[in-house]
C-alpha cells in the first residue's frame, strides 16, 4: 500500500473532512496532470480568525482570505507544501457563488495545489487561467 503523502489537519475549527481517500486520489490526479508528484502536502482547515492572524503574521496583509499556500518544495516537479483554508470563508463564498460548500471547498483544495504547480492569480489573465484550471480540476472528480 502506498504511503500517504497528503494530510488533513484542523486548527480552531470543528470541521470534519469527508471522503478523504477519494480527495487524496483526486489531488494526486491533478498533480500528475500538471506533471508534478506530491511528496508531502498538508491541508490545515481553520477559522477566519486563525487565517487572518496568519495573513497578518506571514504576509503582512490585514484582511480575511480563504486560503494561504506555503510552498516548501525543494525539487522542481515535487510538491511539498502547507495549505491553510478558512472553512468560514469557504462557507461564505459558497453562498456568494451559489455553490455547495463541498464544491467550493474542492475548488479551494485544487486552487492551493495549483499554486504549488506554479499557477498565480494576481493579474486578471492569471486569475482567468487559475479559474479555468480549477474548473478542469473539478471535472476530474470521480466522487
Swiss-Prot record:
Disulfide bridges in this chain: none
A Gene Ontology BP annotation from the UniProt entry: rRNA processing
Chief subcellular location: cytoplasm
Keywords of the record: Cytoplasm, Endonuclease, Hydrolase, Metal-binding, Nuclease, Ribosome biogenesis, rRNA processing, Zinc
EC number: 3.1.-.-
UniProt keyword annotation of Cell division present: no
Record SUPFAM superfamilies: Metalloproteases ('zincins'), catalytic domain
GO molecular function: metalloendopeptidase activity; RNA endonuclease activity; zinc ion binding
EC supergroup of this enzyme: hydrolase
A Gene Ontology term for the protein's cellular component: cytoplasm
Coiled coil feature spans: none
Binding positions (Zn(2+)): 111, 115, 121
Pfam families: YbeY
InterPro entries referenced in this protein's UniProt entry, alphabetically: MetalPrtase_cat_dom_sf_prd (IPR023091), YbeY (IPR002036)
Database matches in PANTHER family: ENDORIBONUCLEASE YBEY, CHLOROPLASTIC
Family as reported in the entry's similarity comment: Belongs to the endoribonuclease YbeY family.
UniProt function note: Single strand-specific metallo-endoribonuclease involved in late-stage 70S ribosome quality control and in maturation of the 3' terminus of the 16S rRNA.
HAMAP family in UniProt: Endoribonucl_YbeY
Protein name, per record: Endoribonuclease YbeY
Organism: Cytophaga hutchinsonii (strain ATCC 33406 / DSM 1761 / CIP 103989 / NBRC 15051 / NCIMB 9469 / D465)
Amino acid at each position: 500500500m502506498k504511503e500517504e503523502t497528503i494530510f488533513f489537519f484542523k486548527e480552531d475549527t470543528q470541521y470534519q473532512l469527508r471522503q478523504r481517500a477519494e480527495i487524496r486520489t483526486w489531488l494526486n490526479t491533478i498533480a500528475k496532470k500538471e506533471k508534478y508528484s506530491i511528496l508531502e502536502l498538508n491541508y490545515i482547515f481553520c477559522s477566519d480568525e486563525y487565517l487572518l492572524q496568519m495573513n497578518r503574521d506571514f504576509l503582512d496583509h490585514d484582511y480575511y482570505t480563504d486560503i494561504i499556500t506555503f510552498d516548501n518544495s525543494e525539487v522542481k516537479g515535487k510538491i511539498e507544501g502547507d495549505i491553510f483554508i478558512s472553512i468560514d470563508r469557504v462557507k461564505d463564498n459558497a453562498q456568494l457563488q451559489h455553490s455547495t460548500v463541498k464544491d467550493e471547498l474542492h475548488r479551494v483544495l485544487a486552487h492551493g495545489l495549483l499554486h504549488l504547480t506554479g499557477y498565480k492569480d494576481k493579474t486578471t489573465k492569471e486569475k482567468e487561467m487559475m479559474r479555468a484550471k480549477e474548473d478542469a480540476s473539478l471535472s476530474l472528480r470521480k466522487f
